[in-house]
Amino acid sequence: MLKSIKSSGVTAVLDHDGFNKRIRVVRYDGAIEKALPDIVAAAKEENAEKIIVYAKQHDEPILAKQLFAPEGYLKGYYLGHSACVMVRYLSESRRQTDSYTEEQEIIEAIYRTAPRLRNDSTPVFTMRKAETNDMYQLSMLYKKVFRTYPTPVFDPAYIEKTMNANTVYYIMLDHDRLISAASAEINPELGHAEITDCAVLPEYRGHSLTSFLIEALEKEMAGEDIVHVFSLARASSFGMNAVLYHSGYQYGGRLINNCFIAEGLENMNIWCKQL
């Protein structure tokens, strides 16, 4: 749930994310240090385990003094200027991960593969922009692919709500059956979009469906004058990280125990691209 806070010298937009036990400062203007005491107090009151600030780069030293540490960078997040994802843990267990080196090896293995340039091929299935009457099939797709998910995509009403806001979905169909989807969550005020909600039914994997969907979303974003895009991929997923790498995205760091997705609380890799 997004909330705005205002105090002397600063305004900030906070995502109070109870499901993922975190608070995110997704944007701010002014002296962020003046808002930090209230943010930390709210996080402790809500039993949040992690505070995340999408920090403007000149504020990194200020946040470091307040016990925040960098976990990655989002290129172009603030109207073409990078944001440093700085975090402060309020739970020792939330800070710990036993899969870090294994996930490093996944990135190293991907880097050893030569980038595959996109060609003019077309998907073997039907691809189109989703409409509101697709929300039921979309929710069923996400239920089949993910055991848990950080946002309420299992609820058709939530999908409809996002469609009517600033989220664009593209889908892939085998005749009338929805088999794959991806979305772009647009932030027109900050000039970026997040490629997210990527899902493919297991029996349809291996056809590069996600790559086609991402390419379609990128074209849509370019048409809206959005040139900076990013995506968060499960650090344990070779396939999704490889798709982003071969789609021209650059690795930007790893967010530890970032959100509940698929098998539980997972690390997420940052990938960024300028269109």
UniProtKB/Swiss-Prot annotation:
Alphabetically ordered keywords of this record: Acyltransferase, Transferase
Class of this enzyme: transferase
Any Pfam family the entry gives: Acetyltransf_1
EC number, UniProt record: 2.3.1.-, 2.3.1.264
Record's description of how this protein is used: The use of YodP from B.subtilis for N6-acetyl-beta-lysine synthesis opens the bottleneck for the large-scale production of N6-acetyl-beta-lysine to investigate its properties as a compatible solute.
UniProt similarity note: Belongs to the acetyltransferase family.
UniProt-recorded name of the protein: N-acetyltransferase YodP
